[in-house]
Amino acid sequence: MRIAGLLEGLSPPAVLYLGCWSGYCAIRLVRACGMGFPYNRRLSSIILSLMIQQIRNIAIIAHVDHGKTTLVDQLLQQSGTLGDRFGPVERVMDSNELEKERGITILSKNTAIQWNDYRINIVDTPGHADFGGEVERVLSMVDSVLLLVDAVDGPMPQTRFVTQKAFAHGLRPIVVINKIDRDGARPGWVVDQTFDLFDRLGASEAQLDFPILYTSALNGYAGLDEKVRSGDMTPLFRAIVEHCPPPQVDPNGPFQMQVSTLAYNSYVGAIAIGRITRGRVRRNMPVTLVKRDGDEHREKIGQVFGFLGLQRIEVEEASAGDIIAVAGIEAPNVSDTLCDPEHVEPLPPLAVDEPTVSMTFQVNTAPFAGRDGKYLTSRQLKERLERELIHNVALRVEEGNDPEKFRVSGRGELHLSILLENMRREGYELAVSRPEVIFRERDGEICEPYEQVTVDVEERHQGGVMEALGSRRGDLKDMVPDGRGRVRLDYLVPSRGLIGFQTEFMTLTSGTGLMYHVFDHYGAARQGGIAPRRNGAMISNSTGKALGYALFNLQERGRLFVKPGDEVYEGQVVGMHSRENDLTVNPLKAKQLTNIRAAGSDENILLTPAIVFSLEQALEFIEEDELVEVTPRSIRVRKRHLKEHERKRAGKGM
């Protein structure tokens, strides 16, 4: 009826023209309105209104590893957007090398699919709360969310995090219960848990009235009945079209768009991505760029890109409601506003949660510095961190009194370790300190961050895990046995109590436990410290290649981090002592050879395999007087003071 009302009074040729548009081709109709048809301005307005009615902007949010990226693969494939030339796809949205290795989404991505006459812009967001800065800024571009929940696990801590963000933006959810074909699926329980979660988060009546779909993203089917085991994704496409509202935007007003994320192309430079909230944009159009601090610059749009499938497609013009990318803007930042020069109206800056964890990044001063990396100096380190700040909105970098040290703060250990991993792959060498939580003062009271922790363990490991979390000042909030030999424990734990806990947890549960944690709130700081590492370090007293004979004699004292032939230096931690104290050792000691024939035969040297740390494990292991040396080829643990007499002097001064 609405469309019929819009068409009333138009000439037959104009009505005929409206039947042939699809996707971006509708832009050409707008530009063709000067062909002599009557009511051409009205025709232009009607076409734009119809275009907007056919757009859906939706984000997929969920807990890590519940199947977001796999679901996007199926939507792209079954909509026909990719076409036959792409063949079968697998996690196409995880384009980053680290994402494919770890099986997690780190950066939010944009794509668009054509389904029937609808254009559906999809944003795939990270599930880890450490990348919450990504989640928060992309929610400003969409009108609804697909909330993906595992049919066995139900809502998890990070489901709560991203859902809370969506509700704060006033978005209505479409609940998708994924992995419905998984053994032990309990969709009824999951729906109840999801409803309870929404209620606790203060959802409105409209947000509580959510549609539910049951899917298997891996097998490519969806349905309205929990017993569905075949079919395709049509029910999900239909639900998106029916329950996600079209963008509430003004297509005829002066141009306005907020930059939500950034990309980079070596040919065109920085690319600003966002949703047009008002008006239209075309190539070579003059605009005003308003920075977060209110500073204004005149710029000119170079190129305009739309999203389709896996590609960015250059278009002549784009209209309000669509998610686009523009090139040609000099040094854009997230939260900047692009406006019509005659109507400069900046949008409110995007709010991002403050960091909770900090580390010190410093120049590598170890004896082997410069052997592996290309970028070593404080100037190169500073430039790299400043580049990261442009698009990593949840990151903070501060310079201290020492020009070779930078205090880097982020949303969690994973957030910072991903940055470090990217830097070492780019050829950077640096040393980093143990992660520390950030304390804040509120109303005269010192507060620290608390995290909601969910652990899923076998019942035989329950006692050890509860004792360990208790010693780290955790409060047990809930305990739910699943009736099949496992139990889920919910805790509230100070963030500093979780630093270094992951490795201990995996040891306690023999590798069978699952642990998830997410920032909850800042609360009153608890008195006393967290118990330090129980084992001391074995520290090398010389520089050279480690020898098997020396390591064979040292392994009685603890676990080794090096193997025969590895180069070590004075002050490097080469093992974990079996006792609490540090021990200075000589891993270079060779067997003394004499000209006296021994009565017995030599002992066969049998070495226990050395512990090889990942970056996260090394950061968890170190104490305050230690650093992790990060290079493109190696991850080493070392003491801050490499010489033994320096360590003794520092120890006396403490």
Regions found by a protein language model. Give the residues of each.
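Canonical P-loop GTPase G-domain recognition
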Residues: 183-241
